[in-house]
């Protein structure tokens, strides 16, 4: 018999929701800092996170090896993520090795491993969760609209709905 938090994360939306619930322990009941609740994971051996002098980080979980020089709000960043100066990440889940270039805006989305979001690109919005698949590049100035599911790289300046 199981008592406590459980969520099926078999969809993009449910995976995003579960990550957002980790950021809200008062309402979700998830306290990852509770010493009685063990977390079993495979953590890469990486240096500590680096938060740059002009970076802003609010209500977020930032894993080892991340380099934050821009703005990160209410987001979960996995190992080795880079957010360049002038970039904004909000209400997002970024998997290992994601790079968000200067001036890019990433909002309400999941970016899979090793995605590169080019300078000035926009991914997601205020509506349904956007998703960008593993290893893809979103070109500089490109736009990936809210709710889009991207499985091929997006060229510079291109728009994907």
Regions found by a protein language model. Name each.
Residues 1-161:
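Left-handed beta-helix
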């Amino acid at each position: 018999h199981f008592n406590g938090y459980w969520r099926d994360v078999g969809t993009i939306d449910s995976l995003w929701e579960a990550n957002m619930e980790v950021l809200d322990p008062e309402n979700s009941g998830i306290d990852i800092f509770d010493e009685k609740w063990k977390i079993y994971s495979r953590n890469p051996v990486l240096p500590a996170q680096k938060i740059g002098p002009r970076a802003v980080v609010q209500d977020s979980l930032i894993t080892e090896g991340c380099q934050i020089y821009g703005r990160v709000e209410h987001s979960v960043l996995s190992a080795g993520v880079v957010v360049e100066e002038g970039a904004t990440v909000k209400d997002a889940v970024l998997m290992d090795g994601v790079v968000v270039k200067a001036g890019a805006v990433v909002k309400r989305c999941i970016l899979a491993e090793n995605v590169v979001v080019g300078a000035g690109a926009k991914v997601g919005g205020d509506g349904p969760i956007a998703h960008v698949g593993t290893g893809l590049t979103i070109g500089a100035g490109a736009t990936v609209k809210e709710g889009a599911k991207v499985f091929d790289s997006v060229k510079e300046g291109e728009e994907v709905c």
